[in-house]
């Protein structure tokens, strides 16, 4: 069911992303927007401390983070995570994607993309450039 108050639903799938998750989530909460957005987190039974980090951010930002934390890995059972768990929860007019081991560096990312889509109704999607880095932050080729 759509909700007029939420314009963007951010879909974030997590599996053993503990080393990267805080940076990912900080990229969400630093967003400067003139609209409401939600972050739909799905943890697929991580064996590290990903679930603890998800709960921490959900407690701190309950109006933004909407988690599902699985007890059994769904992907290994052949379950389509987006189709089964993520897309049915979407309330926004627009959907953004960011995996738990990725992160956003631009605090205006969502605002810029929504402005672009709202300005020209012939656009059905937009994306931004990426910078590939290793876990220590060193830029990789590409």
Model-flagged regions — what are they?
Residues 1-142:
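Nucleotide-sugar donor-binding/catalytic module of glycosyltransferases
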């Amino acid at each position: 069911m759509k909700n007029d108050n939420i314009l963007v639903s951010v879909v974030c799938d997590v599996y053993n992303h503990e080393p990267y998750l805080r940076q990912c989530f900080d990229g969400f909460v630093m967003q400067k927007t003139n609209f409401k957005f939600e972050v739909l987190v799905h943890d697929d039974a991580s064996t590290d401390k990903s679930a603890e980090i998800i709960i921490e951010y959900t407690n701190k930002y309950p109006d933004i983070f909407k988690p599902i934390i699985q007890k059994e890995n769904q992907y290994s059972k052949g379950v389509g995570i987006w189709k089964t768990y993520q897309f049915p929860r979407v309330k926004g007019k627009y959907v953004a994607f960011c995996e738990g081991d990725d992160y956003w560096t631009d605090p205006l990312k969502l605002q810029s993309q929504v402005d672009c889509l709202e300005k020209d109704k012939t656009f059905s999607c937009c994306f931004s450039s990426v910078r590939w880095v290793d876990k220590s932050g060193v830029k990789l080729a590409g």
